[in-house]
Swiss-Prot record:
Annotated GO CC locations: membrane
Record function comment: Putative pathogen-recognition receptor. May mediate the endocytosis of pathogens which are subsequently degraded in lysosomal compartments.
Cysteine pairs bridged by disulfides in the record: 77-88, 105-197, 176-189
Gene: Cd209e
Domain C-type lectin stretches: 83-198
UniProt protein name: CD209 antigen-like protein E
Length: 208
């Protein structure tokens, strides 16, 4: 058998070119087949997919449980505030006049305290005793003798009993109300006293 003849440039003769192409095609086909086999082997089986779903469900359950724990630890009120019946109260350690006290509460996202119930009144009266004279958000600045809270609501007749004996007397232009001992007293708004801020407590129910 005659050996294949090399061309002038060292390549095989034209008659042997189809054999080279066949070898090249075989190599490429083999490589492609191997790549397909490897790719298929990486695809997850139905059991693996189910396991992945189960793992994700467990992770979600764990996160939900963690959120519940965080919610229980969530502070309903800021530090130095006191919680009572769904509200937060700040009892000042410094003294201001009535208008400055109102401003200080606004700066904290609150309001100079407005009393909505007899239970709240009892709580505030007892708690404010340690500071003696303490401002609340009640005045008759708009019209003498007509008492209104800062939210514009009038003083209820059922709260009249909390005035101290002989009060309010408007001596010397007393238009703002303070907690004093066991009751309420009207005083000059320019006087410096302790003060109480009030705002609604947080709920810790923010969405994920």
């Amino acid at each position: 058998m005659r050996a294949p003849q090399m061309g002038s440039l060292g390549f095989l003769d034209k008659g042997h070119i189809p054999l080279v192409l066949q070898l090249l095609f075989l190599i490429l086909f083999t490589g492609l087949l191997v790549a397909i086999i490897i790719q298929v082997s990486k695809m997850p089986s139905s059991e693996e997919i189910q396991w992945e779903h189960t793992k994700q469900e467990k992770m979600y359950k764990d996160l939900s449980q963690l959120k519940s724990e965080v919610d229980r630890l969530c502070r309903l009120c800021p530090w130095d505030w006191t919680f009572f019946n769904g509200n937060c109260y700040f009892f000042s350690k410094s003294q201001r006049d009535w208008h400055d006290s109102m401003t200080a509460c606004k700066e904290m996202g609150a309001q100079l305290v407005i009393i909505k119930s007899h239970e709240e009144q009892s709580f505030l009266q007892q708690t404010s005793k340690k500071n003696s004279y303490t401002w609340m958000g009640l005045s008759d600045l708009n019209k003498e003798g007509e008492w209104y809270w800062l939210d514009g609501s009038p003083l209820s007749d059922s709260f009249e009993k909390y005035w101290k004996k002989g009060q309010p007397n408007n001596v010397g232009g007393q238009d703002c109300v303070e907690f004093r001992d066991n009751g309420w007293n009207d005083a000059k708004c320019e006087q410096r006293k302790f003060w109480i801020c009030k705002k609604i407590a947080t709920t810790c129910l923010s969405k994920w």
